[in-house]
Amino acid sequence: MRHYEIVFIVHPDQSEQVPAMIERYKSTVTSQGGQVHRVEDWGRRQLAYMIQKLAKAHYVCVNIECGKETLAELEHAFKFNDAVLRHLIVQTKKAETAPSPMMKEVQREEAKKAAAQSEQAA
């Protein structure tokens, strides 16, 4: 089995369905003998360019270990899901379990917001 990093972008109107989508994709991988090493929900972010007249979208990153058949099934699911605007699958050499640089940035932004809210409350 090989290791893969998958990033997919979801339509912002479908953001509330992201946890269900993640569970569906995780169950697809695990039911066929694969493993999910890391799941990161990066949240709603600004797009680099307009996609379908949208400026923002919901980003999700998943690191998995699976076979070719499972990967083909996932790619098929991404292609025919209208809520998924774009997806990228990259083969990696080893399983990534540490937080990605993007997730660290998301955590920093959340910490700044929390600090600003606590200052306003005080």
Curated annotation (Swiss-Prot):
Transmembrane segments: none annotated. Keywords: Ribonucleoprotein, Ribosomal protein, RNA-binding, rRNA-binding. CDD domains: bS6. GO terms for biological process: translation. It comes from the Bacteria. One of its GO terms (cellular component) is cytosolic small ribosomal subunit. InterPro entries: Ribosomal_bS6, Ribosomal_bS6_sf, Ribosomal_S6_plastid/chlpt, Transl_elong_EF1B/ribsomal_bS6. Residues 95-122 are annotated as: Disordered. GO terms for molecular function: small ribosomal subunit rRNA binding; structural constituent of ribosome. Belongs to the bacterial ribosomal protein bS6 family. Binds together with bS18 to 16S ribosomal RNA. PANTHER family: MITOCHONDRIAL 28S RIBOSOMAL PROTEIN S6, SMALL RIBOSOMAL SUBUNIT PROTEIN BS6M. This is Small ribosomal subunit protein bS6. The gene is rpsF.
